[in-house]
A protein has these predicted regions:
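Structural motif
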Residues: 33-53, 174-183
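Low-complexity, acidic Ser/Thr/Pro-rich "mucin-like" tracts of secreted and single-pass surface proteins
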Residues: 26-28, 32-36, 229, 236, ...
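Secondary-structure boundary elements
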Residues: 150-156, 165-169, 174-188
Length: 348
């Protein structure tokens, strides 16, 4: 049996340790990595800053062999020893679990310990393109990562490197100075609504699949229990989550399935759901219909780090910058893919 050798690091900028790079004859060595580091104490289901973090605790690699017209399922490898904070692992396939030589696609999937995704459990001969992650309803999203590569498995042994990226988007809303009374009406809810939502994502390409088309409130804050000072809500308390905010601010966010051609609406609402004031969200080019993409971060207001209000640096450009709902009429959403990039969106 070929023995497994591996290493794990909890920070993405740690120096690489010295490891044995040899490949046992006839075996396959998987080098698997996630692109984001661990952030201790942050929630896995909620998003409180633009920090790119991860809490992957279980990883599987699916092998799909080339049958001449498609890549079809052959075998699954469950990568042992992956714990919360691991960003790299080397896994050697055991002697009795080798693949025949040939052309393969490999799909690595990384998940949290208690997510609500159902991931396709492929049967022999099933197409590579059929690999999906599904939730029962919008709001059940959390972190899920995947990555894919094509490689030749050789009789003498092969090394396969797979980098996993997030297959959901992140959406954050950071606001301040929400009035209790506006136009003579009591503000009870602060909501960011998407015109459509998906419940499935293709793990091979990050494209969302619409199984139950429906509008969805990505952010839905009930303000009624908050203290009011000088007519302004004092803000939601997230100290138990390790979050530090500016005074009189509202912060909320979540992961969201990729979805195309949606509009976003920010609004203040009465207890009965009637809108008091709404803003249309735009990107920096003035477009109101856009795509929410996997591994991109969409932010109304800016919060670089959850645990402070200065972004962890002396640069004032990293300071918290919540949208002021008393004065701001144009509101920018930043869209970031690093997550990969941060995009600016505007509300009017």
């Amino acid at each position: 049996m070929a023995s497994a050798f591996l290493f794990a690091c909890s920070e993405s900028d740690d120096p690489s340790p010295v490891v044995d790079n040899s490949i046992p004859e006839g075996s396959v060595v998987f080098d698997i990595s996630t692109v984001n580091k661990l952030n201790n104490g942050m929630s896995r289901g909620n998003v409180y800053s633009q920090e790119a973090t991860q809490h992957v605790t279980r990883v599987s690699v699916y092998a799909f062999s080339n049958n001449g017209s498609d890549y079809v399922y052959a075998k699954t490898y469950d990568i042992s020893g992956w714990s919360d904070g691991t960003t790299f692992k080397r896994y050697v396939v055991a002697e009795g679990d080798k693949l025949p030589a040939g052309d393969y696609k490999f799909l690595a999937v990384g998940r949290d310990a208690a997510d609500q995704f159902t991931v396709t459990s492929p049967s022999v001969g099933q197409s590579y393109s059929s690999m999906m992650a599904t939730i029962a309803q919008s709001g059940n999203e959390s972190e899920i990562f995947s990555g894919t590569t094509t490689a030749q498995v050789l009789d003498k042994g092969s090394r396969v490197s797979i980098e996993m990226t997030r297959k959901v988007a992140g959406v954050l809303g950071y606001f301040k100075n929400v009035p209790q009374i506006l136009d003579g009406k009591t503000v009870t809810f602060l909501r960011l609504s998407a015109s459509n939502s998906n419940q499935q994502v293709n793990l091979t390409n990050g494209v969302g699949v619409n199984t139950s088309p429906a509008a969805y409130n990505i952010i839905d804050l009930n303000l009624s229990g908050q203290t009011v000072t000088n007519g302004i809500y004092t803000g939601n308390n997230l100290s138990a989550q390790g979050v530090v905010k500016v005074a009189n601010s509202q912060l909320s966010g979540s992961y969201f399935m990729p979805v195309s051609s949606v509009t976003l609406t920010l609004g203040l609402y009465e207890a009965n759901g009637n809108a008091i004031k709404t803003w249309s969200v735009k990107d920096t080019g003035g477009v109101t219909t856009f795509n929410i993409l996997a591994n991109h971060f969409y932010s109304l207001g800016m919060k670089v780090q959850a645990g402070n209000v200065n972004g962890g640096t002396d640069d004032p450009g990293d300071d918290d910058d919540p949208i002021d709902l008393l004065t701001d009429q144009n509101i920018v959403i930043t869209i970031s893919p690093a997550w990969e990039l941060i995009h600016n969106l505007i509300i009017q």
